[in-house]
């Protein structure tokens, strides 16, 4: 390729030299003819000769300029062909907004402060130090590198990478080893005296035994039951509501639904009734604390409580009706009495139990 380019350049140079040689004797002859004294009487030949001389001078000047440009291009780009050089000369200059621009490279060190750079350099140095110490020779691959356990909870990682804990009898195991970032580090031995371990066991047992009696803050359902019972009993005491304990005969024959629904929350403002009301609240709080987690939350416990309340109330009404019918023929005063269905003393849980 380079040889063909050189041949083309030599051919163009030889053509230019021959053209210059052919034009030079013609110009010399014309100049000699022009310099000879003419005694011609015609004055019209002088302006024609002067115009020919001017044209010849212009052509010679243009040829000289082209030769100089070609020589400069050959000196600057000796391996570039002449045709490509002429094409580049003929291309118009692009405007300033269409010229391609280069992005200025901005390094991380030019933006950040020297303190941050020093911390990054120290970290990189530390990582290099750890990798050089931890990485074995490339010629002899270690068996640990061949086994890749990607799962974090696999049996291998649990067995080989967990820290050994102290035994239950108070004796401590020898210092364990664990691997972190391919570096084996020695774990300092942990000495737990037997006294601390026994204290922890006693505290756990106490917390389990006292958890049932620790009802503060009160559970959610117990709070609402206390508020409803206090509200209903206060309105009944002030004679705003006329409530009484529900009797099955009135429920069946007179449709006394209001007393059947509100009588479980009703109690009298006497000392025995208030003591029974407190005992019922304690029972409900203990059951809610122990059963709410087993059932699936407070909402499920409320649903279960409503179902039990309705079913037990219906069962008690049916049993009371049968008992009053059975005993009413012997004791007529029991036909429309509420002796078998006393109030639940402020809580519907007594209907269930």
Swiss-Prot record:
May be involved in transcriptional activation. Residues 11-26, 36-58, 165-174 have a biased composition (Polar residues). The keyword Nucleus applies. GO terms for biological process: regulation of DNA-templated transcription. It comes from the Eukaryota. This is Putative transcription factor MTF1. Residues 148-164 have a biased composition (Basic residues). Keywords: Activator, DNA-binding, Nucleus, Transcription, Transcription regulation. Its main location: nucleus. GO terms for cellular component: nucleus. GO terms for molecular function: DNA binding; DNA-binding transcription factor activity. It is found in: Nucleus. Residues 11-96, 129-174 are annotated as: Disordered. The keyword NAD does not apply. It comes from Mucor circinelloides f. lusitanicus. Residues 59-95, 133-145 have a biased composition (Low complexity).
């Amino acid at each position: 390729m380079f040889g063909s380019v050189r041949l083309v350049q030599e051919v163009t140079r030889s053509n230019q030299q021959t053209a210059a040689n052919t034009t030079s004797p013609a110009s010399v002859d014309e100049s000699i003819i022009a310099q000879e004294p003419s005694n011609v009487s015609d004055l019209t030949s002088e302006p024609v000769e002067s115009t020919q001389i001017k044209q010849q001078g212009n052509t010679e000047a243009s040829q000289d300029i082209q030769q100089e440009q070609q020589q400069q291009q050959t000196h600057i780009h000796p391996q570039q062909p002449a045709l490509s050089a002429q094409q580049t000369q003929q291309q118009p200059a692009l405007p300033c907004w269409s010229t391609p621009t280069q992005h200025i490279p901005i390094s991380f060190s030019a933006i950040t402060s020297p303190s941050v750079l020093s911390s990054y350099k120290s970290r990189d140095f530390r990582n290099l130090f750890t990798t050089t110490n931890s990485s074995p020779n490339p010629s002899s691959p270690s068996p640990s590198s061949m086994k890749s356990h990607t799962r974090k909870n696999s049996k291998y990682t649990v067995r080989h990478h967990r820290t050994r804990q102290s035994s239950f009898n108070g004796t401590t195991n020898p210092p364990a080893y664990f691997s972190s970032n391919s570096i084996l580090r020695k774990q300092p031995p942990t000495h737990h005296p037997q006294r601390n371990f026994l204290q922890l066991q006693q505290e756990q047992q106490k917390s389990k035994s006292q958890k049932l009696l620790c009802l503060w803050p009160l559970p959610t359902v117990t709070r609402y039951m206390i508020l409803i019972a206090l509200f209903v009993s206060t309105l009944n005491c002030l004679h705003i509501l006329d409530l009484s304990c529900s009797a099955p005969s009135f429920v069946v024959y007179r449709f006394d639904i209001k007393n059947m629904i509100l009588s479980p929350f009703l109690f009298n403002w006497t000392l025995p009734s208030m003591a029974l009301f407190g005992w019922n609240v304690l029972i409900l709080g203990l059951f809610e604390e122990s059963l709410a987690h087993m059932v699936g939350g407070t909402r499920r416990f409320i649903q279960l409580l409503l179902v039990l309340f309705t079913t037990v109330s219906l069962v008690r009404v049916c049993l009371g009706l049968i008992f009053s019918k059975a005993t009413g023929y012997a004791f007529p005063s029991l036909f429309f009495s509420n002796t078998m269905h006393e109030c639940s003393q402020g809580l519907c849980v007594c209907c269930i139990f």
